[in-house]
């Protein structure tokens, strides 16, 4: 099996290396990842500037490709020909932090995986809750990612489905099962912080308290709050079918 691996935290992220080592048990892994951090970069693509790809070495000495574009650029370039073969699976992660609920709209990790769906390749995004904290252990999340990837291939996951996987912190004894979930409700508490530079010109930071979410039963938030791995199947058809029907009853003409 040929696997394309990317992320949004950058090619030298410890989460990516841990995931690569596990996925190599399933097949050949090609890494094409951003050269810098693109967290919350969403599905941006570079259209009005050149993109460059350079070979780098990961911490274990293995080769990888670093791109100066976004996570979606990395996967897009790989699929357009930077890889010399079409992958069977696109995997993105392990993200240094959760991608739950509304996070999927902002997440570069999810966007990299979603780019695989654009060209009809089944994909998986993997995130470790609180993975940004010093000393985070990615081994449990990487092991779960390998198992989920193997199952996705065995079940012939459709090529228009992305599995958004969130793994809670904890040992294998604590994080010992998974739940299939729906997206929950993320609560953001963003605040605009305005400051002045030394020349008196304003600049802004987006700050505020850390976001949380509603741990409702059946949701990704509920699963990880109870030490379960959350597996949420996503696709990019965002059509609200109820309102297709309701809006169709309106009069849409120039009369």
From Swiss-Prot:
Cofactor requirement: a divalent metal cation
EC number: 3.1.3.5
Subcellular location: Cytoplasm
Family from the record: Belongs to the SurE nucleotidase family.
Keyword annotations from UniProtKB, A to Z: Cytoplasm, Hydrolase, Metal-binding, Nucleotide-binding
Cofactor note: Binds 1 divalent metal cation per subunit.
Gene3D superfamilies according to UniProt: Survival protein SurE-like phosphatase/nucleotidase
Entry's Gene Ontology cellular component terms: cytoplasm
Function: Nucleotidase that shows phosphatase activity on nucleoside 5'-monophosphates.
Top enzyme category: hydrolase
Reactions catalysed, as given in the entry: a ribonucleoside 5'-phosphate + H2O = a ribonucleoside + phosphate
Protein origin, superkingdom: Bacteria
InterPro entries: SurE, SurE-like_Pase/nucleotidase, SurE-like_sf
Alphabetical list of Pfam families matching this protein: SurE (PF01975)
Protein name: 5'-nucleotidase SurE
């Amino acid at each position: 099996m040929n696997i394309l691996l990317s992320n949004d935290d950058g090619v030298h992220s410890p989460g990516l290396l841990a995931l690569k080592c596990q996925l190599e048990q399933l097949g050949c892994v090609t890494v094409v990842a951003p050269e810098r951090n693109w967290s919350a970069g969403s599905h941006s693509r570079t259209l009005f500037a050149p993109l460059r790809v350079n070979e780098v070495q990961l911490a274990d000495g293995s080769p990888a490709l670093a791109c100066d574009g976004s996570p979606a650029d990395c996967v897009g370039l790989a699929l357009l020909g930077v890889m010399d073969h079409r992958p069977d699976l696109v995997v993105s992660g392990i993200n240094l932090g959760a991608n739950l609920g509304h996070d999927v709209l902002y997440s570069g990790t999810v966007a990299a995986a979603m780019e695989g769906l654009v060209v009809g390749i089944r994909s998986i995004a993997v995130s470790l809750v609180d993975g940004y904290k010093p000393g985070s252990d990615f081994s449990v999340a990487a092991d779960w990612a390998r198992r989920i990837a193997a199952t996705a291939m065995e079940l012939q996951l459709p090529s228009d489905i992305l599995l958004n996987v969130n793994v809670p912190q904890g040992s294998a004894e604590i994080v010992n099962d998974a739940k299939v979930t729906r997206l929950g409700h993320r609560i953001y508490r963003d605040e605009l912080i305005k400051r002045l530079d030394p020349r008196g010109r304003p600049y802004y930071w987006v700050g505020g308290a850390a976001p949380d979410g509603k741990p409702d039963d059946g949701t990704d938030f509920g699963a990880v709050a109870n030490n379960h791995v959350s597996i949420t199947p996503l696709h990019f058809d965002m059509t609200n079918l109820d309102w297709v029907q309701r809006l169709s009853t309106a009069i849409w003409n120039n009369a």
